[in-house]
Amino acid sequence: MTLTIKEVTQLINAVNTIEELENHECFLDERKGVQNAIARRRKALEKEQALKEKYVEMTYFENEILKEHPNAIICGIDEVGRGPLAGPVVACATILNSNHNYLGLDDSKKVPVTKRLELNEALKNEVTAFAYGIATAEEIDEFNIYKATQIAMQRAIDGLSVQPTHLLIDAMTLDNALPQVSLIKGDARSVSIAAASIMAKVFRDDYMTQLSKDYPEYGFEKNAGYGTKQHLLAIDDIGIMKEHRKSFEPIKSLL
């Protein structure tokens, strides 16, 4: 008895490798519906394979440390919120567990919101340790954004429940005695930094969404404090509030 296209599609969707797909008995079924199902499954498997290869590439710096220090406890550190006109800069320090596998990890700005939230939940539940560090708008104005970012990163490290032995940091160096590697675009090159990027992004977005409940005119739940048209118009109409960065333009010129 010939299987229906629906039944064949179910079999095809259970295939886990391209090689298995090409050797499957259904591969020779010439019905258009079957061939379409095969094409869809191939595309999905190719995408998954690309994510796996990307993930392996992004473990390079972790593996280099582990070659020399097999028992190393590696902490990835990243921040979000250097550019907005309002709100804190938020850093996250993340120590992945030894059997980590979070396909789709990348620079948080490149990850779709739904996937970002999914990864964030998995990371919070499964990593060895994580902690956030915040530098306020007042501290940004007092020290400058670069120094405030360093402060936020160190606070995140200090908040960890597990002491790391090595640091992987996105494009920054810290006044810290631990061995550290600073990576330009580290959130796209290291799984540890990418994990910290995701977690910091979700934390700060949530913070700004909560802030928008007290200050709805600025649209923080949509712009996260960046200088969008709505945000700038609100500044013109009602002025600034305590979490605006007074050292940033155009706010600085308004004071």
UniProtKB/Swiss-Prot annotation:
Compartments where found: Cytoplasm
Q: Name one GO cellular component term.
A: ribonuclease H2 complex
Cofactor dependency:
Mn(2+); Mg(2+)
Gene Ontology process terms (BP): DNA replication, removal of RNA primer; mismatch repair
Gene3D superfamilies, A to Z = Ribonuclease H-like superfamily/Ribonuclease H
Catalytic activity, per the record? Endonucleolytic cleavage to 5'-phosphomonoester
**Its EC number(s):** 3.1.26.4
Stretches assigned to the RNase H type-2 domain: 72-255
Binding-site residues for a divalent metal cation, renumbered to this chain: 78-79, 170
Q: Show the GO MF annotations.
A: manganese ion binding; RNA binding; RNA-DNA hybrid ribonuclease activity
State how the cofactor is bound: Manganese or magnesium. Binds 1 divalent metal ion per monomer in the absence of substrate. May bind a second metal ion after substrate binding.
Q: Which domain of life is it from?
A: Bacteria
Ordered alphabetically, the record's keywords are:
Cytoplasm, Endonuclease, Hydrolase, Manganese, Metal-binding, Nuclease
The record's annotation in PANTHER family points to: RIBONUCLEASE H2 SUBUNIT A, RIBONUCLEASE HII
What functional role does this protein have?
Answer: Endonuclease that specifically degrades the RNA of RNA-DNA hybrids.
Q: What is this protein called?
A: Ribonuclease HII
Taxonomy of the source species = Bacteria, Bacillati, Bacillota, Bacilli, Bacillales
